[in-house]
UniProtKB/Swiss-Prot annotation:
It is a single-pass type II membrane protein. SMART domains: P4Hc. It is an enzyme of class 1 (oxidoreductase). This is Probable prolyl 4-hydroxylase 3. Fe cation binds at H177, D179, H263. The gene is P4H3. Keywords: Dioxygenase, Endoplasmic reticulum, Glycoprotein, Iron, Membrane, Metal-binding, Oxidoreductase, Signal-anchor, Transmembrane, Transmembrane helix. One of its GO terms (molecular function) is iron ion binding.
Amino acid sequence: MAKLRHSRFQARKWSTLMLVLFMLFMLTIVLLMLLAFGVFSLPINNDESSPIDLSYFRRAATERSEGLGKRGDQWTEVLSWEPRAFVYHNFLSKEECEYLISLAKPHMVKSTVVDSETGKSKDSRVRTSSGTFLRRGRDKIIKTIEKRIADYTFIPADHGEGLQVLHYEAGQKYEPHYDYFVDEFNTKNGGQRMATMLMYLSDVEEGGETVFPAANMNFSSVPWYNELSECGKKGLSVKPRMGDALLFWSMRPDATLDPTSLHGGCPVIRGNKWSSTKWMHVGEYKI
């Protein structure tokens, strides 16, 4: 009887082991197929990566082929976890950047900030650019860009405000600020702002970086630190590059506000800076 029990136990043990080995084998096959088809690739080991473990990931160039014009190789760069910030390289094509600028140019006005008590726009010396809003879903190209933003962020398109196009000339800037609200008035429509997608529509010869002065990291460890302006060296900074998009979160994963998301636009020293911002809310944003 004891022998029979032992035999059954051994049979069950071998059966479980074979099942586990089979599952591991199938998982390996699936991963190899995903790699072969370019759905994802292994992290690239870059000798120039900094001690903060900047990570680089490749997207298949064919994964997001819709839109105006042809985009270059798309890849994602992890900048920081405090705040959560990522750069999507070649997020927009050159033609899409130029299209947004051409739509906005005839309607540019002096940029304002939101009054926390009334919710109305007001002039402020902390923001010296010019800008305009493009209504959400106003045409096919805008819809395509907004859908792309939704696909990358997993935030529905109807949670976003209209695209804001901004223009900074030499000397113009935006002092460090938060995109989230600290009042109840501005959260009535859509709730709190949870994330921002900042798309660069032009290159900038010098200056104009997006800077995070409260980021929890060693600012000087990034490979491009020596290329930054004095303003850019005061925090974690991203240099404007046509077609790139910077995504950062104003809220932590536990839904609390993230003070490390403090950010600003450094003064443009040489050239012009064009950008487009999409603010995304916790709930549906009605327009």
